[in-house]
């Protein structure tokens, strides 16, 4: 791992805030694409409604001065350049596809919170040392094509691209055909895109934060059926004449792996938000990103813990709070200049 993107304490940015009204308006605007009678959203992956949602988010990104790259599984990366474009970008996002009877916030919040970070930096006329990218991944939900977290899984090398293209829905339409139909099969090979660190803001999809009156959940892990022991292997060298930048130092890398969680906790504390550690009971694209780069997740409460449902709801105050934490964390890694 390059020492160029190791955690660096930021300038004092505690007073900086995202525009909560703008973020809320964007969430409500995107939710109109595929809106359901009960106030939810039905925007299945790689349908025309998905195309409309993608077009809208990309339009907003371009208005914010961002460049756009699409890979061969339809993952979309929107980039705000850094002062040092050679550094791997600090990336944040989620997904915009929904369940058949889904809500306004699942996935969409993570993408638009990340976009709001960029808009806020533009408002403040703040440049960053490292580039910042907003991503939305293809088919996180798995409600039309199986498996879930498809786009991030292909990106991480978990699912072979050509095999994934061949997966069909119940009508016999393949992923590859659907990508072609909506015009979102890009040129970049999935995975040929560096990531310095990855952060994902998300509704909790459970009742714990609301029950305990906590504003921020600092995600410690995602439940699964596999457990891993992580062994970081370095190379011994004389401590005196070998500078840190030329070492293969195992402790340095292991420390970096832990810093994302610490950064989120620190940001929540500095902003004065009640927070607690939490484990995610649902899967997220951040799982596969953790295979590739240091990764963190920020949870906010959702009413009654309800998600994957048309009545899914998060308050404007919590939506803004999570995005403010995301702003602080991304700045600690992208480094304002």
How does the language model describe each region?
Residues 2-47, 308:
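N-terminal capping segment at the start of a domain
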Residues 35-81:
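A non-catalytic alpha/beta surface segment that caps or lines the substrate-entry region
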Residues 98-171:
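A generic, well-ordered mixed alpha/beta core segment in the N-terminal half of proteins
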Residues 21-36, 93-94, 275-324, 333:
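Zn-dependent metallopeptidase/amidohydrolase metal-coordination segment
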Residues 238, 242-264, 300-337:
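His/Asp/Glu-rich mid-to-C-terminal helical/loop segments that flank catalytic regions of hydrolases
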Residues 74-76, 96-98, 132-143, 205, ...:
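Acidic, glycine-rich active-site loops and adjacent beta-strand->loop/helix elements
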Residues 64, 76-109:
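Catalytic-core environment of secreted peptidases
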Residues 139-140, 144-266, 270:
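Midchain, well-structured core segments that form catalytic/ion-binding scaffolds
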């Amino acid at each position: 791992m390059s020492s160029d993107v190791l955690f660096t304490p930021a300038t004092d940015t505690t007073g900086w805030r995202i525009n909560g009204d703008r973020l809320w308006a964007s969430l409500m605007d995107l939710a109109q694409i595929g809106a359901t009678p009960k106030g939810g959203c039905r925007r299945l992956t790689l349908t025309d409604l998905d195309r409309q949602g993608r077009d809208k988010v990309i339009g907003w990104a371009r208005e914010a001065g961002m460049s756009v790259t699409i890979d061969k599984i339809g993952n979309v990366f929107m980039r705000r350049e850094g002062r040092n474009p050679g550094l791997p970008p600090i990336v944040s996002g989620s997904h915009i596809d929904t369940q058949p009877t889904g809500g306004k916030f699942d996935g969409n919040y993570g993408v638009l919170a990340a976009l709001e970070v960029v808009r806020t930096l533009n408002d403040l006329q703040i440049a960053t040392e490292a580039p910042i990218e907003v991503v939305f991944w293809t088919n996180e939900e798995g409600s039309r094509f199986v498996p879930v977290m498809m786009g991030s899984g292909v990106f991480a090398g978990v699912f072979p691209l050509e095999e994934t293209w061949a997966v069909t829905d119940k009508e016999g339409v393949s992923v590859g055909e659907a990508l072609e139909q909506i015009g979102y099969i890009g040129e970049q090979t999935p995975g040929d895109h560096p990531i310095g660190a990855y952060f994902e803001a998300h509704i909790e999809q459970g009742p714990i934060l609301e029950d305990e009156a906590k504003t921020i959940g600092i995600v410690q892990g995602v439940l699964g059926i596999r457990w891993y022991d992580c062994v970081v292997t370095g190379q011994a060298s004389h401590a005196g004449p070998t500078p840190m930048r030329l070492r293969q130092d195992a402790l340095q890398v292991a420390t970096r792996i832990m810093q994302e969680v610490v950064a989120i906790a620190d940001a929540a504390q500095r902003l004065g938000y009640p927070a607690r550690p939490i484990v995610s009971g649902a899967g997220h694209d951040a799982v596969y990103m953790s295979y590739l780069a240091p990764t963190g997740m920020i949870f906010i409460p959702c009413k009654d813990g309800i998600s994957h449902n048309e009545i899914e709801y998060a308050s404007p105050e919590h939506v803004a709070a999570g995005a403010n934490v995301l702003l602080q964390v991304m700045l600690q890694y992208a480094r304002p200049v």
